[in-house]
Amino acid sequence: MATPANQTGRITQVIGAVVDVQFEGHLPAILNAVETKNGNNRLVLEVAQHLGESTVRTIAMDTTEGLVRGQEVTDTGNPIMVPVGVGTLGRIMNVIGEPVDEQGPVANEGLRPIHAEAPTYTDQSTEAEILVTGIKVVDLLAPYAKGGKIGLFGGAGVGKTVLIQELINNVAKAHGGYSVFAGVGERTREGNDLYHEFIESGVNKKGGGEGSKCALVYGQMNEPPGARARVALSGLTVAEHFRDQGQDVLFFVDNIFRFTQAGSEVSALLGRIPSAVGYQPTLATDMGALQERITTTHKGSITSVQAIYVPADDLTDPAPATSFAHLDATTVLNRAISEKGIYPAVDPLDSTSRMLSPLIVGDEHYQTARMVQQVLQKYKSLQDIIAILGMDELSEEDKIAVARARKIERFLSQPFFVAEIFTGSPGKFVELADTIKGFRAICEGKYDHLPEAAFYMVGTIEEAVEKGKKLAAEAA
């Protein structure tokens, strides 16, 4: 039975983000949104615990400075509701669906609750199809599934957000689909930059409306933990609406680790006993509740790309380790590769995808990917010998393998459209067939005569040949 709405209660205690509210003869359901006024602002509190017959403990979705005991609170009778529909495209909303871009109210096709059941087994679709991103290293070695979940793993400052921006740019242009971007606990400056870059690159129009392709839902670093723990669900709700209308939606989360981190803060505030490394005891449940809703149905698909910060570059930390279980593909960014100046700094041996199977991608693609990985693996295993004894001690066969591996490493780099501003190199979208052809030719030794530098920061193999000719002419 639905809770009768507009029941009022009074605040009895405020401790940071935790607010206790006492109702008279009425108890709001867990996860209900209750509202109060804080100055001129609407403050939404989400019910987290029942403390007695008529008292609830809530988590605030905004700062609680200025709240006083005895203040009136109203039960809305529903979970947090956010606006959905094409009116959200090009706009920035917060966790409770209010616009924060100063462009007026959000035009919507109704409101949806942020807590919902995952689609049933019978509603889910299981077809395997590849999403071509135009990024060589991704398409060749760890291809993304349409309607799959992709994890972008990397420490601080190795290029996760830039890779996400490039994916949004490439897929919006090549695919024409809608995207939803959930900014969870990341830098406000990055969120602001992203908003303006979308307008400059034509992904969105200022103020939203016709021609906009991406809805933004932000709960940044400075927000209380309640907002950061729920903003991913608000973004997902917007994406689910598009999917249910038959769209193929891209859902970006930057950063899923902050979702876990906020959950851990909320858990501590509610007095739960922490588990391993101080994380919440409900870590797997929280992650599962979010991830199971990101799926493809017979109506449409949600392909999700999730940036996953890896604390201290330790992949065995419970937060990234719990995320691994849900993913179809992983793109691991490696600091050692970014230090060589190779961007995107994707680790070709650590990144995986369940789509890399001859039954899905075909024999030629599969064999080329495996050849590339074998050459790189051989180079990796020889690195200790090279470091101690030098290249001269290697056999002729090994010398050739190392030379090819170094060319492959450089050919895995690529100029990005979204990085044009600070690299000066125009971005490249490389078709899958060109990617396969180029890497196969390098592995087979057709370009052994070209210098390594020719393969650095180019798109197709033809561009590498051109660059090689230029370098030869300059050296002459």
UniProtKB/Swiss-Prot annotation:
Keywords: ATP synthesis, ATP-binding, Cell inner membrane, Cell membrane, CF(1), Hydrogen ion transport, Ion transport, Membrane, Nucleotide-binding, Translocase, Transport. One of its GO terms (molecular function) is proton-transporting ATP synthase activity, rotational mechanism. It is found in: Cell inner membrane. Its EC number is 7.1.2.2. This is ATP synthase subunit beta. GO terms for cellular component: plasma membrane; proton-transporting ATP synthase complex. SUPFAM superfamilies: C-terminal domain of alpha and beta subunits of F1 ATP synthase, N-terminal domain of alpha and beta subunits of F1 ATP synthase, P-loop containing nucleoside triphosphate hydrolases. The keyword Transport applies. The gene is atpD. F-type ATPases have 2 components, CF(1) - the catalytic core - and CF(0) - the membrane proton channel. CF(1) has five subunits: alpha(3), beta(3), gamma(1), delta(1), epsilon(1). CF(0) has four main subunits: a(1), b(1), b'(1) and c(9-12). Produces ATP from ADP in the presence of a proton gradient across the membrane. The catalytic sites are hosted primarily by the beta subunits. It catalyses: ATP + H2O + 4 H(+)(in) = ADP + phosphate + 5 H(+)(out). Belongs to the ATPase alpha/beta chains family. PANTHER family: ATP SYNTHASE, ATP SYNTHASE SUBUNIT BETA, MITOCHONDRIAL.
